[in-house]
Amino acid sequence: MFLSLRPSLSVSRLAVVRRAYSSPASKKQINDGLVPLPHKEVIDMAFDLHLPERSVIGKLPYHSPEPIIFFHGLLGSKRNYKHDCKKLATALQTPVYTVDVRNHGSSEHALPFNYGTLVNDLVHFIHQHKLGKVNIIGYSLGAKVGMLACLKHPELFSAACIIDNAPEPQPHIKAFLSTLIKSCVKLLDQGKVRVDDKLWRHKASESLKRYLPNAGVRNYVLNNIVHNPRVVEYRSPVINYDDGLIHFKNPVRHMLDCGVKDVADWPTEEVKDKKFLGPVNFIRATKSAFINPDSLKAINSFFPFNNIHEINATHFVLNERPQEYLRAVIDFFKVTRYQLENKRNKDPNNYMQTQNSISNSDTMGQSL
């Protein structure tokens, strides 16, 4: 399953992507109107693989039956969390895959951009790399992808760590998401910052400041800026990186709609009778609106064997409290998950009833 003992192995599918999209959008296309994104039901997500720096089994080849997949949030990327995932790989003695979801980082730009499609990309990734059963860590958008994947494909997941999100529609976060993406579009339309400007980052930050006063949030967004077109790993078909201006790695103009409506949504009817019986750890940022007291009913309904760990932070908890969230993740996979499994196994009647209910539901679904 794992071919190397190197601590960090970058294996993005860049050559294939470049061949598929070797002709970026021209200036004329950009100026004449919004070039449509291609439609793809499944993409090969770009990824990095982080292996433990020290193995408890000495010089023997390291092997783990349960690798971890780390799914980032909206406007995030695998690069943002490479140091965190290296620490997790070593602390947990297991391989950690960090991926770029579609329209982010080094992965392809394509529609649809909704949770069902992102789950399909994740399932494809697991099968493509022959990972078997995995654990998932999901943050924000990635948290909802992880929850939905566990509910729809429980056979592929052992445990999940869900960071500051809940399995429910969240219309109250649409304003936040809209501001986040619109600030990027405003920077492109009004900032017109050149790539050869030595003060490009300062000027971009000042442009965003009107909409994003928090410096930490601005830095999170600025991590997506392309200021050197010669090192762009993925040449988007809808972005002209050769016009002398800075650009985002994301097709932000195309995400104005789906990046708000679909990201705040949740397929309630599709999963209303489903449960995931594996252990799930919810990390709740206490200064965030993504998990509120009303969310607990949905969490307990879908994930009966859960633990909720609170951290005093905003929704950007990974940036604000990196050591605290890492400790919470490590403690969950080392200790709490087994406590939740024991709790589940001590109530075999309830466990078997739930299993039979899920099995019958799946059988009915297949017959329709």
From Swiss-Prot:
Location of region: Disordered: 344-368
Gene Ontology cellular component terms for the protein in this record: mitochondrion
Keyword Electron transport part of the UniProt annotation: no
Location of this chain's protein in the cell: Mitochondrion
Biased composition (Polar residues): 348-368
Catalytic activity: ethanol + acetyl-CoA = ethyl acetate + CoA; acetyl-CoA + H2O = acetate + CoA + H(+); ethyl acetate + H2O = ethanol + acetate + H(+)
A molecular function GO annotation: carboxylic ester hydrolase activity
Keywords, ordered alphabetically: Hydrolase, Mitochondrion, Transferase, Transit peptide
Entries under PANTHER family matching the protein: PROTEIN ABHD11
Protein name, entry field: Ethanol acetyltransferase 1
Organism of derivation: Kluyveromyces lactis (strain ATCC 8585 / CBS 2359 / DSM 70799 / NBRC 1267 / NRRL Y-1140 / WM37)
